[in-house]
Curated annotation (Swiss-Prot):
It comes from Mus musculus. Residues 442-636 form the VWFD domain. The gene is Susd2. Its main location: membrane. It holds the Pfam family AMOP. It is a single-pass type I membrane protein. GO terms for biological process: negative regulation of cell cycle G1/S phase transition; negative regulation of cell division. Residues 804-820 are cytoplasmic. Keywords: Cell membrane, Disulfide bond, Glycoprotein, Membrane, Receptor, Signal, Sushi, Transmembrane, Transmembrane helix, Tumor suppressor. Residues 282-430 form the AMOP domain. Residues 25-64 form the SMB domain. The chain crosses the membrane at residues 783-803. Glycans are attached at N159, N176, N491. Residues 23-782 are extracellular. This is Sushi domain-containing protein 2.
Length: 820
């Protein structure tokens, strides 16, 4: 009887509303957030398990909003904590060193103001309610790159181009600024200019970054959400700042007061505040700045050798999502507004900064999928000395997100290309990478019932019920695990097929990310170190050892520091997962997704090294899958309900009592065969899933997932590149594509003649069929022919005139001799 009641007991336990607390427990979460020992728990999983200390939410804080710009000034409120006692002062301390003043509002809610930071990602903070004597309350704040927060959280430069070209050509007049007054509830505001600089010897210990308050544009003006002014040149002591941002804050604050509630503009080129010398001759001023940048750049280390080569095609760039990600400044999915790269439809950036110099790669592509190179056009992609997204450990040059990039790569572009005609100097020091050394990553996937396609191309099905090792690597201690659970038949009974319901990943000592279906639904839930994340504010997160992106409700992308990448998405009632591994992982993998070594024959390798043949029976393959079950000590999964605890912690990781439906155990009726053939279009995985679940929708989802895998695999096929081919001196070329089969044609300027081949073809061996020809001084064929025919015409004309004159003379002589 007790055994029969157990499933019902588990069901009731799993539906206990959270957060739950351990009744009567005397323990406290003061200074214990994350701890699981003691009489009660302060761990994030305690809410679902009902084991929390009674003061859990008072000390382990939830905040709203939970994120904001790294520029600071965001007011956030602590949820659940009500403070009715008198307080000497509220102090919020970020990263154990940066303190801001908080307050208690009229509703007894505690507030903090986020500080100005030089890094992005999750920032731990603590709160003191006794003016700094103790900090027992703890939480985390997500600091985001300024360009990745919503526009409503910033003040807006109306016609930003006008601001950044002010003083050039005939760009004059008023400048306008707007903001959302509800985001800054105060009757009067002050508008200030802040400047950013990095000082000290580059790449030394005294290289520092700093935001500085410069001067006010307006003080104590009504908070109307609009400000207009005519810029005047700044005083000489402020003109060394060329990059900065405006800050709007309450007029109650003293000038330049740090870390107060405020709205910032985007960082921008401060053309509008530069001196009279800039306004008198902006081209000469910018040229001098460009030459100075050029001289400094030539003294700095060469960062280009550290950068990865760009993918050869747009398809490769979009498919290689572990190493490259969309550049928000040129996104094909958002209208291809490519301000700095006209002619491009999409750009990507290398996800990880280079290890030594913190630099970044950029790759841009045309609508035809061809890479745009600076050697051919100023619209080409340009690498960055400072990665736009920054680089851990952040805080110091050139690793400050956004700002280091502005100083070393963007403002110099204004000097050389936008304000002065010196762009070749810039492009020489920021040349596009071609793709001769690019190697696409290797792809493996799992989807449907589930079905697996290994890195070496072996495909099989394994309907296990449990938690399994999808991938382990010895190169970087990368671990990817999957949880598979039974599906449901159309009549509600348990199917004899399973599917992935959770995927977890960790690399070395990185954070742990788990992606799962929430509560048996088709809604994705993402957990960071066993705590559920919210994506209502941010869809991009900088985490320890990885980046996380949620571009849609049904897909999560995880980019690891090694260059490996995962994409987890919803396909029907289950999850699908695709894993991308760079070539360096060759011979370093094991698990259900095989041994990556270009040899599919050893993909069914057991833990003990025994290898099953590729023609192993379905039952043997099932035993292979079961052998890769995880253990309690190695599991990356979160067990935050008693149902999960009893099933996967107290129970076996692989359920030996679950009997899947093997392909040879069932057949379809003729009518079913016809329906399935029409639905599945020959996809055997789709057919198997219709048979095991009785659901055509499940089969269709599997077919789509398989097609997506095949499409990505096709996009990632290696492409031969012959590299950039220059035009001849004093001539030009036709053709900007340098991949196998491409033809480049040559011609010469007037006054020069072509010596050598008229075209060259990129061959399969990566070499051009012909070298670039020469254009030698001399008359071109066109000019020569013109001279020849012109000379002949002149000779003919002289001959005609001579003949006419001769005839006239003869006629005159005849007339004279006939007179009397």
């Amino acid at each position: 009887m007790k055994l029969a009641l157990l499933p019902w007991i588990l069901m009731l336990l799993s539906t206990i509303p959270g957060p739950g607390f351990t009744a009567g427990a005397q323990g406290s979460c003061s200074l214990r957030c994350g701890a699981q020992d003691g009489l009660c728990s302060c761990h994030p999983t305690c809410s679902g398990l009902g084991t929390c200390c009674e003061d859990f939410l008072d000390y382990c804080l939830e905040i709203l909003p939970s994120s904001g710009s790294m520029m600071g000034g965001k007011d956030f409120v602590v949820q659940h904590l009500k403070w009715t006692d008198p307080t000497d002062g509220v102090i919020c301390r970020f990263k154990e060193s940066i303190q801001t003043l908080g307050y208690v509002d009229d509703f007894y809610q505690v507030h903090c103001i986020s500080p100005l930071l030089y890094e992005s990602g999750y920032i731990p903070f603590t709160i003191s309610m006794d003016n700094g004597r103790s900090f027992p309350h703890a939480g985390t704040w997500l600091a985001a790159h300024p360009y990745k927060v919503s526009e409503s959280e910033k003040s807006q430069l109306v016609n930003e181009t006008h601001w950044q070209y002010y003083g050039t050509s005939d760009t004059r007049g008023n400048l306008n600024l707007t903001w959302d007054t509800s985001a800054l509830p105060t009757p009067a505001v002050t508008i200030e200019l802040w400047g950013y600089e990095e000082t000290g010897k580059p790449y030394s210990g005294n290289w520092t970054s700093k935001w500085s308050y410069l001067y006010p544009l307006a003080t104590n003006i009504p908070n109307t959400g609009f400000f207009t002014f005519t810029p005047k040149p700044a005083s000489p002591q402020y003109q060394r700042w060329k990059v900065g941002a405006l800050r709007i804050s309450s007029s109650r604050n003293y000038p330049g007061e740090k870390d107060v509630r405020a709205l910032w503009t985007n960082d921008h080129a401060l053309a509008w505040h530069l001196g009279d010398d800039f306004r008198a001759d902006s081209v000469a001023w910018a040229r001098a700045q460009c030459l100075a940048w050029e001289a400094l750049e030539d003294q700095l280390p060469n960062f280009l050798t550290e950068l990865p080569d760009c993918p050869c095609t747009l398809a490769q760039a979009r498919a290689d999502s572990g190493r490259f990600f969309t550049d928000y400044g040129c996104d094909i999915e958002h209208g291809s507004v490519c301000t700095y790269h006209p002619g491009a439809v999409h750009c990507v950036r290398s996800v990880q900064a280079s290890p030594r110099y913190g630099s970044g790669q950029q790759c841009c592509y045309t609508a035809a999928g061809t890479q745009l190179l600076t050697s051919d056009s100023t619209s080409g992609s340009t690498p960055d000395r400072g990665h736009d997204w920054g680089a851990p450990p952040y805080r110091t040059p050139p690793r400050v997100p956004g700002m280091s990039h502005w100083l070393y790569d963007v403002i110099s572009f204004y000097y050389c290309c936008l304000w002065a005609p010196e762009c070749p100097r810039y492009m020489k020091r920021r040349p596009s990478s071609d793709c001769r050394n690019y190697r696409p990553p290797r792809l493996a996937s799992a989807f449907g019932d589930p079905h697996f396609v290994t890195f070496d191309g072996t495909s099989f099905s394994f309907s296990g019920n449990g938690e399994y090792v999808l991938l382990e690597t010895t190169l970087s201690d990368l671990r990817v695990q999957g949880r598979a659970q039974p599906g449901r038949m159309p009549n509600g009974t348990q199917a004899r097929g399973t599917g992935l319901t959770a995927v977890a990943v960790q690399e070395d000592n990185s954070d742990v990310i788990e992606v799962r279906l929430a509560g048996g639904s088709r809604v994705l839930e993402v957990l960071l170190n066993q705590k559920v994340l919210s994506f209502t504010e941010q869809n991009w997160m900088d985490l320890k050892g990885m980046f996380l992106s949620v571009a849609a409700q049904d897909k999560v992308s995880i980019m690891l520091s090694s260059g490996a990448g995962l994409e987890v998405g919803v396909q029907g009632p289950f999850l699908s997962v695709s894993i991308l591994l760079p070539e360096k992982f060759l011979t370093h993998t094991r698990g259900l997704l095989g041994t990556l070594n270009n040899n599919p024959r050893d993909d069914f390798t057991l833990r003990n090294g025994q290898v099953l043949p590729l023609n192993a029976s379905a039952q043997q393959v099932f035993q292979f899958g079961a052998d890769w079950a995880v253990s309690n000590t190695s599991s990356l999964f979160t067990y935050d309900s008693w149902l999960l605890v009893y099933q996967f912690v107290y129970g076996p990781k692989h359920n030996p009592n679950f009997k899947p439906l093997f392909p040879d155990e069932t057949t379809l009726s003729p009518s079913q065969t016809e329906d399935v053939a029409r639905l599945c279009e020959g996809d055997r995985f789709c057919i198997l899933d219709v048979m095991s679940t009785g659901s055509s929708s499940v089969g269709n989802a599997t077919r789509i997932a398989h097609q997506l895998h095949q499409h990505r695999l096709k996009s990632l096929q290696p492409v031969v590149s012959c590299g950039w081919l220059p035009p001849p001196a004093n001539g030009h070329k036709e053709g900007l594509r340098y991949l196998e089969g491409s033809v480049v044609r040559f011609s010469c300027n007037n006054g020069y003649s072509l010596v050598g081949p008229e075209s060259s073809t990129c061959q399969a061996d990566g070499k051009w069929s012909m070298p670039t020809p020469e254009c030698q001084p001399g008359r071109s064929y066109t000019v020569l022919l013109s001279i020849i025919f012109g000379g002949l015409a002149i000779v003919a004309l002289i001959s005609i005139i001579y003949m006419m004159l001769h005839r006239r003379r003869k006629s005159n002589m005849t007339m004279w001799s006939s007179q009397p």
